[in-house]
């Protein structure tokens, strides 16, 4: 079944603002085995010009996957999750996320297309402070694998 193209432009929001904390940053840095002191040591981060520890560059995936998850879970989108693979991920930063930031995330379906028997779903997640300052845009492309050709 094809992805419902009527969903192009549909947006999903986090149910509440997300507080970026030192603990969450450290846990994420631990999970990706990154010992960078900018993610762990407030004094080191302040010496580098930040107000507190900063999050690793891929940290926003936590927020963008929430929006993507809402889209994927919508039965009317008609996306067969058993056939989904992650195709691409990009981040466009205005500045790093820092401990103490309280942010919102709005994920929008920006493209749906077919290519070589597969379908591609692109989602853009705009992450901003609750005061409206843009921090980062996360762009996720999911590939819904088509059926294998008959006889293979």
Curated annotation (Swiss-Prot):
GO terms for molecular function, please? (3R)-hydroxyacyl-[acyl-carrier-protein] dehydratase activity
Give the MaoC-like domain ranges. Answer: 7-116
Q: Name one GO biological process term.
A: fatty acid biosynthetic process
Domain of life, per lineage: Bacteria
Pfam families (alphabetical) = FAS1_DH_region (PF13452)
Q: What InterPro entries does UniProt report for this protein, alphabetically? A: FAS1-like_DH_region (IPR039569), HadA-like (IPR016709), HotDog_dom_sf (IPR029069), UPF0336/Enoyl-CoA_hydratase (IPR050965)
Q: Which family does it belong to?
A: Belongs to the UPF0336 family.
Q: Which HAMAP family match?
A: UPF0336
User: What's the name of the protein?
Assistant: UPF0336 protein Tfu_2666
Can you name the source organism? Thermobifida fusca (strain YX)
């Amino acid at each position: 079944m094809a992805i419902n193209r009527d969903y192009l432009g549909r947006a999903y929001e986090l149910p509440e603002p997300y507080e970026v904390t030192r603990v969450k940053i450290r846990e994420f840095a631990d999970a990706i085995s990154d010992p960078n002191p900018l993610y762990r040591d407030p004094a080191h981060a302040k010496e580098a010009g930040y107000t507190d520890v900063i999050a690793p560059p891929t940290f926003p995936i936590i927020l963008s996957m929430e929006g993507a998850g809402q889209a994927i879970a919508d039965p009317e989108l008609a996306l067969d999750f058993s056939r989904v693979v992650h195709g691409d991920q990009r981040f466009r930063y205005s500045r790093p996320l820092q401990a103490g930031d309280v942010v919102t995330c709005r994920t929008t379906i920006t493209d749906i297309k077919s290519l070589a028997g597969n379908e591609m779903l692109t989602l853009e997640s705009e992450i901003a402070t609750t005061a409206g300052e843009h921090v980062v845009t996360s762009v996720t492309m999911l590939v819904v694998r088509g059926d294998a050709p008959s006889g293979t």
